[in-house]
Amino acid sequence: MSSSAGSGHQPSQSRAIPTRTVAISDAAQLPHDYCTTPGGTLFSTTPGGTRIIYDRKFLLDRRNSPMAQTPPCHLPNIPGVTSPGTLIEDSKVEVNNLNNLNNHDRKHAVGDDAQFEMDI
């Protein structure tokens, strides 16, 4: 049997991927899950597999929206991060704890205890 490159197979024609631009007027229309490409482009996919790519101008416009300036709901209480004013008090307590630990470490001679145990 011999085969040749021209045995009835035609090379497929290349086609452009169909795209369309949809203007979104409300941030609530954005999906909840995003993905990124190695180049940093943000995109999302629909349940049907359609990829939605967000351009830079659109995302920069949304950065200054009132919704972007509002913290998310149901945020945990993290002192100094989500609740202001407690960072100074907590940092003083933390510094005192570090000083106590350093004083405790100085009481032991260097090399008394093994850093970790290893079974051979």
Swiss-Prot record:
A motif (Secondary EIF4E binding site) lies at residues 78-82. Signal peptide: none annotated. Changing T46 to D/E: Acidic residues do not mimic phosphorylation state. Does not induce folding of the intrinsically disordered protein. It is found in: Cytoplasm; Nucleus. The modification Phosphoserine is found at S65, S83. Changing T37 to D/E: Acidic residues do not mimic phosphorylation state. Does not induce folding of the intrinsically disordered protein. GO terms for cellular component: cytoplasm; intracellular membraneless organelle; neuronal ribonucleoprotein granule; nucleus; postsynapse. GO terms for biological process: insulin receptor signaling pathway; memory; modulation of chemical synaptic transmission; negative regulation of translational initiation; regulation of synaptic plasticity; social behavior; TOR signaling; translation. Phosphorylation at Thr-37, Thr-46, Ser-65, Thr-70 and Ser-83 is mediated by MTOR and corresponds to the hyperphosphorylated form: it abolishes binding to EIF4E by inducing folding of intrinsically disordered regions. First phosphorylated at Thr-37 and Thr-46 by MTOR, inducing folding of region encompassing residues from Pro-18 to Arg-62 of into a four-stranded beta-domain that sequesters the helical YXXXXLPhi motif into a partly buried beta-strand, blocking accessibility to EIF4E. One of its GO terms (molecular function) is translation repressor activity. Residues 1-48, 65-120 are annotated as: Disordered. The modification Phosphothreonine is found at T37, T46, T70. Its main location: cytoplasm. A motif (YXXXXLphi motif) lies at residues 54-60. Keywords: Cytoplasm, Nucleus, Phosphoprotein, Protein synthesis inhibitor, Translation regulation. A motif (TOS motif) lies at residues 116-120. The TOS motif mediates interaction with RPTOR, leading to promote phosphorylation by mTORC1 complex. Belongs to the eIF4E-binding protein family. Repressor of translation initiation involved in synaptic plasticity, learning and memory formation. Regulates EIF4E activity by preventing its assembly into the eIF4F complex: hypophosphorylated form of EIF4EBP2 competes with EIF4G1/EIF4G3 and strongly binds to EIF4E, leading to repress translation. In contrast, hyperphosphorylated form dissociates from EIF4E, allowing interaction between EIF4G1/EIF4G3 and EIF4E, leading to initiation of translation. This is Eukaryotic translation initiation factor 4E-binding protein 2. It comes from Homo sapiens.
